[in-house]
Structure formats: structure tokens, C-alpha cells
């Protein structure tokens, strides 16, 4: 039997390790599409999530977060590009899915809940619904990221607005179809404009006002293009889904899948700590005032009720139109929040 010299063993071993590591690195370097601005706290949390996965896999799975839609992949197209693996992972938010998945879009609309307590009760049901629905699209819900308790305010330039009557004379920016429908019921003209285009739309007069939470107004420099704001309703803060392309996910070793799920669960726990949310909202409003935004008295109780009533009609209609599981999903959420 011919014996290989030790140097040959070493050379062969080195070549094997080099080759397998090359394949390994190429297969598990993933892109994550995040449509939110890099300055948002959620974006910072996603960076931390990616670091946690990298550390847990000893660098074997490297997830690079691309913020602000820098990959050129649009939020409302996520059900089209994510299953193909154009990016292996992406942030999925049901509010953007109205065109391709009306049943998902109808799960939980703006105005679905009337308080933060109701919203917190709805979250476990929402997670179950999204997990089941996204799997039908070839998307693995590897985890979730919660939103803080947010408060939707109407930011306007020019004439101060803190009543629905005045809002009827303005052009309003919103972010989802259900909001267009709800405001239409109130006689308000609203149009969908992405947050990356919102600043220019306000500056150039495409719209006069925008629905946005005070907590995040600084991330899109709203104080530069508006001069007043007033609170209208509690935001139905749908949890974001950390979606993964199923065909890419299946190529991961189980240990890596578990690392992603574990890091995602830690992210969800951090993002659903609501202890300081009310204080943060107050501080955000004060900061905006210091930057020149006049914080007005809230919309009246009757206006707030009118918005929630209009939203309830929109939600019911959207569920009926969507068909399938939409009505059952709505019933599950109503039961969870005690209605």
C-alpha cells in the first residue's frame, strides 16, 4: 500500500477546507430587505438581530440588512420577490399587501382597535394568522418584531388642522388602502404615498397633511415640511414578520434555523416591552414643538369616535370582499380583544 507523506495529507486537507468554506460562505451570506429608514429604532434592532445570528452560528450565517429599500425591492411587492429569493429575507408588513393578498391586508386595519390594551390582546392571534397565511406564499415566518404603542397624529403645513371638518378641505397622505377607504367615509380625500416619498410630497404640495406617529416623525424630518400636528387615533401596530424565502430557508442546517428563530424571539421580546412608550410619545411631541411644530389640542372625542366607527365599517367590508379566511380571522381578533 502506498503511503502519502504528511505534507500531502496537509495539502489535501487545506484544499478541502478552503473549498468547503468557500461554498459555505457563498451559500449562507444572506440579504435582508428592510424598507424602513436606517434611523428608525426597528432598523437598529434588525442590525442587532443579524449580529446575534452571526454570533450564534460562528459566522456561518451572515445576514446583511439593507435599510431604506436600498435593494430596490418594494414593500408592496414582497409577496412576489421574497419567495424567489431576490433577497433571502425581508420585512413583511400586512398593511402593504392589499393588492396581492387582500385577506392578509384585511386582518387588522387602522382603527381596528380603540386602545393600546386591545392591541396587546390581539398580537398573539395576529402572529398565528400571519404564520399560516404567509406559508401559502412560500414565505417562512422566521420570527416577528413588534411595534411600540404608537399614536397616529395628523401633521399639516399651513393652516392648523385638528378637526375632521377642517381635514375635509385638505389632501391627506396615508400608507394603506384601508385608510383611504376609512377617510373617504369621513369625506376626506386621502392617497397612499410611501414614507420615502412623503417628505417631497408635503414640500411640493402634492398633499397638505400626513398621518404619522410623533415618535418617528424625526426619522423623516416632518418638522421641516409641516408646522402643526394633532392626535387622532391609536395605531393598530401590526407586528412585522421576519420573512424568509422558503426555498432558501430549506437549505439551512437545522442549527442555523434554530439560531435565526432564537434571535428573532429575543427581538420580539425586546420590541414588545411597552413600559416607556407613553413617556416616549410625550417626549417626541415636546421635541417636535422645540423644532417649530405647533402641537394642537387632540381631535375631539366625537371626531375620534367617528374615525373608529368608519374604520369598523371599512374592516367589515374589507373582510367580506377578501373572502376566504378573512371573516374568520376578523372574528378571532374581535374575540381576543373582548368585543
Provide a role label for each language-model segment.
Residues 18-25:
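Sec/Tat signal peptide C-region and signal peptidase I cleavage site
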Residues 120-133:
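Signature of the catalytic double-stranded beta-helix
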